[in-house]
Regions:
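Sigma70-family region 2
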Residues: 12-16, 39-46, 58-76
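Short, Lys/Arg-enriched C-terminal cap helix and immediately downstream tail that follows
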Residues: 180-193
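Short amphipathic alpha helix immediately N-terminal
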Residues: 136-158
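N-terminal module of bacterial RNA polymerase sigma factors
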Residues: 1-31, 35, 64
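Helix-turn-helix DNA-binding module
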Residues: 152-174
Length: 193
């Protein structure tokens, strides 16, 4: 527990203006973030040029702009970093698709089994991002759960920990129900396209 308390303390120090706190935090979460980035990149095409280390570093460049964010704990930070990495990959995919201009892209539907803890092969990240944007308008809490679980790789208990700091505290049972609902909704949306 000391490690988690240290991470939470460093996040609070950083949000209060201590830029060196982020530097001290980095080695404590870097391996976890790198593993997460590597799992994302396993789903990318063979000629993908972005490496896991570069993806983590790009996300760190973005998170530096969020210093005054109300950081809650390690799970919250990892979830935000996962979201940043997702956005980087979506932007990368959009640029790649724009460069192709060949129109021969094959859409591969997302099966319900594929919507699990981490990004799976054959998921069209641009399409998934668009569907998640629509979902978040109608179901913001459930969309946050999807981001934390699907992209952040957090467990139900870790997601509850993130929400425990919010005004919108929810139980693990509610998170599980919301996760089942979100999976079904996203599956329906992505297979109907």
């Amino acid at each position: 527990m000391i490690l988690r308390e240290n991470i939470t303390g460093l996040l609070h120090e950083w949000s209060e203006g201590d830029d060196a706190a982020l530097e001290r935090l980095t080695p404590l979460v870097y391996d976890e973030l790198r593993r997460l980035a590597a799992s994302y990149l396993k789903t990318e095409r063979a000629d993908h040029t972005l490496q896991a280390t570069a993806l983590v570093h790009e996300a760190y460049l973005d998170v530096r702009e969020m210093r005054q964010y109300s950081w809650q704990n390690r799970a919250h930070f990892v979830g935000v970093m996962a979201n940043l990495m997702r956005r980087i990959l979506v932007d990368y995919a959009r640029r790649h698709n724009a460069e192709k201009r060949s129109g021969d892209n094959v859409k591969v539907p997302l099966s319900q089994a594929e919507l699990s803890v981490s990004v799976k092969p054959n998921v069209d990240l641009v399409e998934l991002d668009q569907v998640l944007e629509r979902f978040s308008v109608e179901h913001p809490r459930r969309a946050k759960i999807v981001e934390l679980k699907f992209f952040g790789g957090l467990t139900i208990d870790e997601i509850a920990e993130v929400f425990s700091q919010d005004t919108d505290k929810i139980t693990t049972a509610t998170i599980e129900r919301d996760w089942r609902f979100a999976r079904a909704w996203l599956h329906s949306e992505m297979t109907s396209v």
